[in-house]
């Protein structure tokens, strides 16, 4: 009996020890699993961080490379970027068009003499097909009292619309992504749209022209850090035109141009833009077929907007081909100051532009005008010597020779036969 009792006690003791060993083993396994799970979680977390950091570095490098190799004209870059520096809803007059609007008209001079604010949103060689996009971009930030379109972009033959390098100058540099994509769909041929939506595909070979890339990149960096645009888009080349006197130019107003202008007029109406002036600025060559301007005038006025050609007003303005042009298409600093004085009075008289800006805006514009005056004075002195230096926004911040090198290291010829400054030296006109 006692042996059976002892045997049972020993058996139960062994069973209890077995259960305890099993329980401890199970707990140890769970603990090890928990430790392993924590280590795995930390490992996954570190992996995610590494992937995220790599992705961030890749994006930054890709963005830098894309921007560095995006080689478009420096004056266009400065003009477009400068527009975004203007405080919202502070511009009275938007000047839109090709290079005439930034070569022939100075917003700071108009401010000093007439008290209204304006901006020259121009792109060299811009065809009329871009004007709608330019207005669309302007309206994202400004509600101007008057919009002025210089019509030269509509007065060329149809091949003018096929120069994609001019389209890139605008499309690749604007900030509003929706407008950029809409513009590509509207005016770029389908077989070329990929070069606009994926610009690195187009620009990747620009490493061969590293100096030009550096020049345009320097302009982008400079405009990024600029607090405002002192020149308000204005730009000039310090020289006299060497175009032989008596030359004539034939204008075109093709069906394609008419269609683009009609679309622009419809857009102005749809957006409720009430005061619009389509204008022809003075050019050196006489017009061979002035009836073309009558056709433009008829179309514009059929929509209730204004048209004015100032080609016939050159003598009244005081502009002469000997002293006031830097090439056959653009006024030099002498001519632009004369035309700005005339245009400022014309706009003030016809559109009743009141100087009703805040003290802060008036102070800012006064400072911009002061700084622009220095650049304009330097340009006038260089023009007397026909040195050919290019003055634009970056001339406010950099030595004139260096800033000129940024502008004159062209990617392509500008609007109408404009050449790099080193090719522009001509004898001083007496």
What are these regions (language model features)?
Residues 164-273, 357-410, 420:
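Secreted/periplasmic serine-hydrolase-like ester/acetyl group-modifying domain
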Residues 146-158, 220-316:
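Conserved, well-ordered alpha-helix/loop/beta-strand core segments that scaffold catalytic motifs
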Residues 2-47:
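N-terminal Lys/Arg-rich, disordered targeting/topogenic segments
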Residues 91-105, 330-333:
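Catalytic nucleophile-elbow at a beta strand-turn-alpha helix junction centered on a G-D-S/GDSL motif
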Residues 100-183:
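Membrane-embedded segments
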Residues 69-89:
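Alpha-helical transmembrane signal-anchor/signal-peptide segments
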Residues 49-67:
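Hydrophobic membrane-insertion alpha-helices, especially the h-region
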Residues 288-371, 375-400:
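C-terminal regions of proteins
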């Amino acid at each position: 009996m006692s042996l059976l009792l002892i045997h049972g006690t020993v058996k139960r003791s062994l069973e209890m020890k077995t259960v305890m060993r099993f329980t401890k083993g199970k707990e140890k396994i769970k603990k090890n699993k928990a430790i392993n799970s924590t280590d795995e979680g930390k490992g996954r977390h570190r992996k995610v961080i590494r992937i995220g950091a790599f992705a961030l570095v890749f994006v930054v490098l890709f963005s830098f490379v894309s921007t560095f190799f995006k080689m478009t004209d420096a004056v266009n870059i400065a003009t477009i970027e400068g527009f975004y520096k203007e405080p919202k809803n502070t511009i009275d007059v938007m000047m839109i068009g090709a290079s005439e609007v930034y070569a022939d008209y100075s917003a700071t001079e108009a401010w000093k003499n007439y008290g209204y604010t304006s901006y020259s949103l121009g792109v060299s060689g811009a065809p009329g097909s871009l004007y709608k996009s330019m207005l669309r971009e302007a309206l994202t930030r400004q509600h101007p009292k008057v919009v002025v379109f210089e019509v030269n972009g509509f007065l060329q033959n149809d091949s003018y619309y096929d120069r994609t390098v001019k389209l890139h100058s605008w499309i690749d540099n604007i900030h509003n992504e929706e407008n950029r994509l809409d513009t590509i769909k509207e005016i770029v041929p389908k077989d070329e749209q990929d070069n606009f939506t994926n610009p690195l595909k187009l620009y990747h070979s620009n490493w061969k022209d590293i100096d030009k890339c550096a020049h345009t990149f320097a302009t982008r960096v400079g405009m990024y850090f600029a607090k405002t645009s002192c020149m308000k888009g204005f730009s000039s080349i310090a020289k006299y035109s060497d175009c032989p006197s008596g030359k004539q130019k034939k204008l075109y107003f093709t069906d394609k141009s008419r269609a683009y202008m009609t679309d622009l007029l419809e857009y102005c109406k749809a957006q409720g833009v009430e005061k619009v002036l389509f204008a022809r600025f003075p050019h050196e060559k006489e017009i061979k077929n002035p009836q073309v301007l009558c056709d433009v005038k008829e179309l514009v006025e059929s929509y209730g907007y204004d048209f004015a050609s100032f080609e016939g007003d050159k003598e009244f303005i005081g502009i002469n081909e000997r002293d006031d042009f830097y090439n056959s298409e653009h006024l030099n600093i002498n001519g632009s100051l004369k035309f700005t004085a005339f245009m400022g009075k014309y706009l003030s008289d016809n559109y009743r532009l009141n100087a009703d800006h805040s003290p802060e805006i008036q102070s800012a514009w006064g400072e911009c005008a002061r700084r622009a005056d220095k650049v304009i004075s330097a340009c006038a002195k260089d023009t007397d010597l026909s040195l050919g230096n290019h003055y634009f926004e970056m001339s406010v911040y950099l030595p004139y020779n260096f800033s000129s090198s940024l502008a004159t290291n062209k990617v392509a010829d500008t609007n109408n036969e404009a050449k790099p400054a080193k090719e522009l030296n001509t004898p001083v006109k007496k």
